[in-house]
């Protein structure tokens, strides 16, 4: 699947990397952001000679776009790379951009008929509030979820083992759960917030909380937040995580970041096989710079019989929109709606999540 907007934005980031910390680098990054945010594909804009009217787009970006569309590569960019002697560095950055999708492609995919759909999506099961590294109160999150038509959601602030993300102490967990109980009473019949936690997967495959602590939550997400730039095999780490009692969602499994790092290196078929046996959901994290797992890996997970969670990983209310990216990846992967926990009833979700202690 070719995504010209993603390719073009990537070329602009290549030029920014070559320009260092200069004003030119800032300009290329601004143009790349404009391209990634476009809700239309660049090609018809170039053909209509209207691309330069997009805010942030200048003559050089227009030229690079024309070269990419008509020649399938940009001579201007390639010459700049050769002149700087940065072929290896740029090739590395390009690997960090594989299997992402732009907003334009997301909108195109979501417009296709068939499931999974935005309309029947019931609730998001990875999000963060002011209780850890998010910026919204619980009340604000509930109102934002209701505005999106959700019936439920799962709050998954960080665990205490990740202090860099202001992970919650167990005393704070007790306080937060009391606040969630109050909200659920207030919104009874309209909305339910589930008590979740995003735990950190240690290098040995265990998570950073004790079993008796994990049992306080209605569902547990386990995610990697360290050793995400190395090429060492971490299959045992990830298999260990999905094999741990109580864990029911493997969050942003690769831990990759767009144009920054590749994330965990693992035999993902082994990981997916282990997850399928325990009915641990593989997350498609829709955060723009994560998109993790991507549609190709998701399709492989589906072949192994996995179930899935499509989440935003929102740290502010506008970021709840990231779930649309996750849904688009799921559609590209051909995942049936019945295999996605975000479309299940509250009763079915809770039975499955609590069953993670016994499977």
Spans of model-derived segments:
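Flexible glycine-/small-residue-rich
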Residues: 69, 127-129, 284
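Charged catalytic cores and adjacent phosphate/nucleic-acid-binding surfaces used
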Residues: 40, 80-121, 138-149, 160-191, ...
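Long, highly charged, low-complexity intrinsically disordered interaction regions
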Residues: 1-114
């Amino acid at each position: 699947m070719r995504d010209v907007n993603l390719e073009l934005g990537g070329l602009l980031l290549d030029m920014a990397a070559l320009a260092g910390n200069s004003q030119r680098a800032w300009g290329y990054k601004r143009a790349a952001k404009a391209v990634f945010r476009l809700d239309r594909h660049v090609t018809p804009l170039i053909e209509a000679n209207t691309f330069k009217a997009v805010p942030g787009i200048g003559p050089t970006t227009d030229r690079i776009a024309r070269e990419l569309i008509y020649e399938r590569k940009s001579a201007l960019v390639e010459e700049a790379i050769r002149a700087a002697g940065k072929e290896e560095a740029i090739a590395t950055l390009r690997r960090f951009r594989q299997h992402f999708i732009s907003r334009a492609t997301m909108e195109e995919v979501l417009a296709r008929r068939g499931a999974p759909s935005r309309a029947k999506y019931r609730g998001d099961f990875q999000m963060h509030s002011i209780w850890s590294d998010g910026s919204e109160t619980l009340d604000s999150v509930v109102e934002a979820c209701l505005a999106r038509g959700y019936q439920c959601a799962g709050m998954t602030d960080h665990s205490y083992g990740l202090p860099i993300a202001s992970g919650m102490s167990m005393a704070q967990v007790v306080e937060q759960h009391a606040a969630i109980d109050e909200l659920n009473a207030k919104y009874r019949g309209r909305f339910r917030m589930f008590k979740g936690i995003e735990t950190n997967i240690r290098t040995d495959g265990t998570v950073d909380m004790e079993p008796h602590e994990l049992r306080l939550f209605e569902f547990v997400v386990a995610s990697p937040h360290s050793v995400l730039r190395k090429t060492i095999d971490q299959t045992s780490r990830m298999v260990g995580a999905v094999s741990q009692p109580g864990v029911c969602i493997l969050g942003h499994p690769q831990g990759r970041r767009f144009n920054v790092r590749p994330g965990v290196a693992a035999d993902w078929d082994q990981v997916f096989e282990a997850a399928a046996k325990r009915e641990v959901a593989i997350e498609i994290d829709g955060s723009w710079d994560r998109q993790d797992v991507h549609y190709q890996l998701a399709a492989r997970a589906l072949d192994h019989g996995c179930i899935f969670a499509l989440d935003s990983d929102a740290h502010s209310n506008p970021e709840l929109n990231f779930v649309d990216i996750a849904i688009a990846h799921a559609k590209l992967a051909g995942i049936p709606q019945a295999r996605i926990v975000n479309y299940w009833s509250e009763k079915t979700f809770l039975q499955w999540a609590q069953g993670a202690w016994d499977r």
